[in-house]
């Protein structure tokens, strides 16, 4: 890896793979701050359901790109990229190594590969109309307008489905034909976590999310915002909302959240395999393995 450009580290992997724990260890060892690349952790008040780093963890290690907006104020990929690039530029000026951590593949790629997403601002009135149509209809519309995007986006992902339609209706072109790229001014070392016992880890974490107050957090969010809010239909929040509405009991919600999370993790694995080329940390000591790779990358 030529050392002509500064080094950026990215720690990626599917949900529940242990990224937060390893990120804290690496950040403390190397005296780094963390740039969040989890799309739901960008929103204020969505703490339990996104497994956002706790206040104590954020005191231990500085975190950026967390709690940027309220859940009813969507952040586009371009807006995220612009906010992240300001912090990255600051880190590079200070000669601090940027450290990205997260599992939102497209957001990671926007920073590591220099994607240029279309500059289409959110369209609140259109999103309201799409919300009234329902996610099933919206995904069918996206399938007709931009099959490539529809095949990449889960039929349950209302936020990304609406964004895809928003771009089509605003520009007359599919979003997938408008995403150019330009090489970023840094080298990238991608480290990947994908433990063999991921299914068990997902089951344990889902149970823990409910024990930590996911239903109560969802109830609070549903009082603050419309229950049709796309973020309240995402994994965990959607099932917790059904408990509040009397459509599921707690055990059913945990089982459904676990299943949806496992399906999501499978899609994440596919994305990382096709779109990224990380060094997969396979040993029993991921911290020491990661430190060795970082030291080698700095030479």
Curated annotation (Swiss-Prot):
Cofactor: Mg(2+)
Catalysed conversion reaction: adenosine(37) in tRNA + dimethylallyl diphosphate = N(6)-dimethylallyladenosine(37) in tRNA + diphosphate
Site (Interaction with substrate tRNA): 104
Listed InterPro entries: Dimethylallyltransferase (IPR039657), IPT (IPR018022), P-loop_NTPase (IPR027417)
Record SUPFAM superfamilies: P-loop containing nucleoside triphosphate hydrolases (SSF52540)
Keywords of the record: ATP-binding, Magnesium, Nucleotide-binding, Transferase, tRNA processing
GO terms, molecular function: ATP binding; tRNA dimethylallyltransferase activity
GO biological process, any: tRNA modification
Origin superkingdom: Bacteria
Region annotation Interaction with substrate tRNA: where it falls in the sequence: 38-41
Positions contributing to ATP binding: 13-20
Residues engaged in binding substrate: 15-20
EC nos: 2.5.1.75
Keyword Acetylation (UniProt): no
Pfam families referenced in this protein's UniProt entry, alphabetically: IPPT
NCBIfam families for this protein: miaA (TIGR00174)
Function (record text): Catalyzes the transfer of a dimethylallyl group onto the adenine at position 37 in tRNAs that read codons beginning with uridine, leading to the formation of N6-(dimethylallyl)adenosine (i(6)A).
PANTHER family: TRNA DIMETHYLALLYLTRANSFERASE
Assigned protein family: Belongs to the IPP transferase family.
Description of how the protein assembles with itself and partners: Monomer.
Record-given protein name: tRNA dimethylallyltransferase
Originating organism: Prochlorococcus marinus (strain MIT 9313)
């Amino acid at each position: 890896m030529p050392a002509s450009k500064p080094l950026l580290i990215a720690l990626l992997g599917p949900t529940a793979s242990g990224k937060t724990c390893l990120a804290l260890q690496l950040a403390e060892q190397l005296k780094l701050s963390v740039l969040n690349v989890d799309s739901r952790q960008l929103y204020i008040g969505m703490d339990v359901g996104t497994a956002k780093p706790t206040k104590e963890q954020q005191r231990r290690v500085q975190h950026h790109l967390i709690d940027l907006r309220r859940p009813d104020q969507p952040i586009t990929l371009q807006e995220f990229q612009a906010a992240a690039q300001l912090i990255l530029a600051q880190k590079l000026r200070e000669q601090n190594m940027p450290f990205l951590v997260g599992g939102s593949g497209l957001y990671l790629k926007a920073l590591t590969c220099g994607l240029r997403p279309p500059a289409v601002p959110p369209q609140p009135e259109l999103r309201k109309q799409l919300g009234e149509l329902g996610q099933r209809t919206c995904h069918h519309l996206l399938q007709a307008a931009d099959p490539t995007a529809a095949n990449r986006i889960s039929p349950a992902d209302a936020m990304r489905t609406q964004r895809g339609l928003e771009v089509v209706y605003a520009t007359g072109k599919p979003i997938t034909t408008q995403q150019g790229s330009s090489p970023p001014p840094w080298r990238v070392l991608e480290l990947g976590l994908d433990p063999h016992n991921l299914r068990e880890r997902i089951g344990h974490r889902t149970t823990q999310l409910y024990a930590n107050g996911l239903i109560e957090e969802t109830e609070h969010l549903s009082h603050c915002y419309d229950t049709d809010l796309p973020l309240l239909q995402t994994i965990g929040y959607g099932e917790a909302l059904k408990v509040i509405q009397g459509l599921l009991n707690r055990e059913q919600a945990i089982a459904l959240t676990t299943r949806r999370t496992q399906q999501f993790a499978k899609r994440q694995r596919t994305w990382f395999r096709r779109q990224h080329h990380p060094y997969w940390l396979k040993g029993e000591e991921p911290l020491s393995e990661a430190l060795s790779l970082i030291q080698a990358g700095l030479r």
